[in-house]
Amino acid sequence: RFWQRGDDAPAAVPAAEPAHMGARIFAALLALDLVLLLLTWGVRALAGQSGTSAQALEFWRCTDSRHYLDIARDGYIAAGDPDRVVQLVFLPGYPLVVRAVMRLIPSDICAGLLTSALCFAGAGCVVYRLLRLDLPHRGAVRALRFLVLAPGCFFFAAPMSESLFLLLTAAALYLARTRRPILGGLCGAYATFTRSLGLLLFVPLLWELVHDAVQRRRVDARQVVGALLVPLGFAAYCYINWCVAGNPLQFLIYQREHWNQRTGLFFSTAAYQTDYFLRSLTTGGWRDALGLWLPNLIACFAALGLLAAAAPKLRASQTAWFLAYYIVAVGATWLLSAPRYLLVLLPVPLA
């Protein structure tokens, strides 16, 4: 049956496992996070941009990091600087955690880096436990390595939402599969409060619910409640939009007007990304061609190819989650960071 394909794995794969594996993974990923920070500093130093330690830290305020840190420090604003007003499009889950850490560390950039480091290390531990439900120790470690060493892994160290989102999605799936669906649903709800793509966790949770209902010939009410909790995080975000801007969907307007961002189709994305890549090459824009458009194209097609090859071996819920996530994430009409969006999609390293 199609909903059972790949779903007959035991509750845990019996295999020898080194002692204190969680602590080892946590320490290893904290060390990797530090290495990523030092490598970034080293590359900038070689480029003649090292500066003081304070300036080295300020570098991490680039790209979307500054938006998350502004929100953590000052919250959302309804009027004033247009660049600050449109920050409503960035969900509050990560900034709220950074704001809590700022009670201990007043510097927003240091609090953001620490938050990401701890979430990255914690995510590694939870991802390993999730992988062990289907894989032996070596297979789980191999998949975890693919995840944390993938191109774009520096996003896990940056003061951005990737590490927290990975932690929450892995926790939601692990708790759901180990018969703690309410806790899993709460983690899923906070994932949707952190990134809108967290809404798509509803797909694997619903799939597991249907699979278990068929296997047991009854529906577990706790699984239903757990799955229904997931959209509540996004509903809370829409409520914040209403409080700040008077429109629960104001973020869609800002995305369209400020970033020309809408929901589209993967085929259109591949077409315009290829077009921009070729245009950049012909006009001498090598930096954009090799640093933006080519990595996007490689990430999009590589992830799809990996999943196509591995689909028969994956749980059906994982395949369904990948397809739903991929269609929405890659279908954006102005996709600038496909490696970043696909980095936190767990079926990719499994493939």
Task: Give residue ranges: language-model regions.
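Membrane-lumen/periplasm interface segments of specific transmembrane helices
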Residues: 32-51, 60, 190-191, 202-306, ...
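Multi-pass, polyprenyl lipid-linked donor-dependent membrane glycosyltransferases
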Residues: 115-119, 134-138, 142-176, 190-201, ...
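Transmembrane-helix motifs of polytopic, lipid-linked glycan transferases
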Residues: 100, 114-134, 302-308
